[in-house]
Amino acid sequence: MPRMLVELEKNKAAAARGDEESLGLLAGRSAVNGLGTTTIQWWRSVDDIYAYANAPSMAHRPAWLAFHRAARRDPSAVTIWHETYAVSAAESLYAGPAPSGLADVAGAVPVGRRGETARERIVRR
């Protein structure tokens, strides 16, 4: 996993400079907790995730194949919890702290005082 994270962050920086085409990673966060390491990533599209995951020249595909070989020998050796959500519209409310999560990646829209509902804010994006 560390090799993939480094590869994606290097590509993100190179794409921001205009040196490479973006693989589609918008942002990522990793945290270590009692269950192990949790990594959350935000991508430009589901198609970008699948393109990266299946590209033989990128770090993910060889690592995934190695994981499957190891899991056949010892299914309890590594646990992967993978969820993909395609989000067309979303809302996150922050009262006080700086935006984080999806709002940090996609930007935040200030909540109006009156007459603006969550539905209106999502449609306006």
Can you say where each PLM-predicted feature lies in the sequence?
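Long, compositionally biased terminal regions
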Residues: 59-66, 84, 89-91, 96-125
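Short catalytic/ligand-binding loop motif for oxyanion handling, primarily in non-cytosolic enzymes
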Residues: 37-38, 49-51, 91
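Short, glycine- and small/hydrophobic-rich beta-strand elements in well-ordered beta-sheets
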Residues: 2-38, 72-77, 82, 108-124
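Tryptophan-centric aromatic hotspots in well-structured domains and transmembrane helices
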Residues: 42-44
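An amphipathic, aromatic/His-enriched active-site/gating alpha helix that lines ligand/cofactor pockets
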Residues: 33, 46-79
